[in-house]
């Protein structure tokens, strides 16, 4: 019987099979340039105010940007956790920041959430390969993973090179869903409003993966765990969120429930912000011209400020990036 590692390598070598949510543009090659020959990528540290987009992004749409966010169940959370998950308690917490962040992190406001289960770690190549083998997910983009000699590909490293639709399909395969922005921030901040998962102390390389050139195996930095026992909530890879990215989400009527505006409302807000010249309003990306998806949790090539619990970043859902992966959530009941 083949090991999971062997299965992973075989699947990556085989290339795309059955797409989860394909479109003509999404199934095209991401980049025609051959991968670099160096053993590891150079360290390019990114932080708020710098553009996090990279040339390895897939350019075509592969999602319905108006798709509704998943509802959070209010049922009892006292049952045993699903495998590989830990409970994030329900309740009220402070989301956002009034100072020390970007415009899209304001204002700080109270949000009430139901309890939910969240993966302890980011999804690994090993785990994602099982979904590909079941023909429920398409493989990660092979051209992305081949970059820098394939150093990002090993069974226990977080899977990357997947789009928002790929991430969503994987979580559905597991019986779960993508987390919402408010849920991820709740998992990081806990009840004490901490700046980072481990507290308010600055990041170190013992606690997390940042300011470096590649990912690490999931769970390799236990001193950086969050308040509810989750690993790598800041650093290693960005994680796709269910939500549409809304730069004015915290001023919307649904802010107390962690709900962004509709795509139409978001496009109008983006148009207004661009007209006002507020291109630096949205952290690590310029103000978009389409409805994009939120990503959270920081990445290996980001600086310390980019790992803050309130930092918000966004990309088109079709992008498949070397630094973006997934972590799944599930509502009790």
Role assignments for model-derived ranges:
Residues 1-26:
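Sec-dependent N-terminal signal peptides
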Residues 4-9, 102-110, 147-150:
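Short, flexible, solvent-exposed loop/turn segments with mixed acidic/basic and small polar residues
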Residues 19-78:
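Ser/Thr-rich, Pro/Gly/Ala-heavy low-complexity intrinsically disordered linkers and tails
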Residues 79-144, 160-165, 187, 234-235:
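A short glycine-rich, aromatic-capped structural motif
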Residues 88, 94, 98-99, 145-313, ...:
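Functional-site microenvironments in short loops/helix caps that host divalent-cation chemistry
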Residues 321-333:
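Short, structured beta-strand segments at or near domain termini in extracellular proteins/domains
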């Amino acid at each position: 019987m083949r090991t999971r590692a062997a299965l992973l390598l075989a699947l990556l070598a085989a290339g795309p099979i059955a797409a989860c949510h394909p479109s003509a543009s999404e199934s095209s090659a991401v980049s025609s340039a051959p991968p670099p020959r160096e053993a590891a990528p150079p360290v390019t540290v990114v932080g708020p105010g710098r553009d996090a987009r990279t040339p390895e992004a897939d350019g075509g749409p592969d999602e319905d940007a108006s798709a509704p966010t998943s509802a959070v169940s209010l049922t009892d959370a006292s049952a045993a956790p699903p495998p590989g998950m830990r409970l994030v308690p329900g309740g009220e917490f402070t989301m956002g920041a009034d100072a020390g962040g970007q415009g899209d992190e304001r204002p700080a406001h109270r949000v009430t959430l139901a309890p939910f289960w969240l993966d302890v770690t980011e999804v690994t190549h090993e785990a994602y390969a099982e979904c590909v083998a079941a023909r429920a997910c398409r493989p990660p983009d092979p051209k992305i993973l081949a970059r820098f000699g394939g150093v990002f590909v090993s069974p226990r490293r977080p899977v990357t090179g997947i789009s928002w639709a790929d991430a969503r399909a994987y979580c559905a395969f597991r019986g779960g869903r993508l987390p919402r922005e408010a849920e991820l921030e709740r998992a990081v901040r806990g009840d004490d409003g901490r700046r980072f998962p481990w507290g308010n102390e600055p990041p170190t390389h013992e606690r997390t993966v940042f300011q470096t050139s590649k990912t690490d195996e999931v769970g390799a930095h236990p001193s950086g765990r969050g308040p509810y026992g989750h690993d790598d909530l800041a650093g290693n890879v960005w994680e796709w969120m269910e939500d549409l990215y809304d730069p004015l989400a915290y001023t919307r009527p649904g802010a107390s429930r962690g709900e962004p505006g509709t795509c139409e409302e978001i496009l109008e807000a983006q148009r207004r912000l661009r007209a006002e010249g507020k291109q630096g309003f949205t952290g690590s990306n310029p103000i978009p011209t389409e409805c994009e998806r939120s990503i959270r949790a920081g990445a290996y090539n980001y600086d310390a400020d980019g790992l803050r619990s309130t930092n918000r970043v966004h990309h088109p859902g079709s992008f498949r990036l070397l630094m973006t992966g997934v972590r799944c959530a599930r509502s009790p009941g």
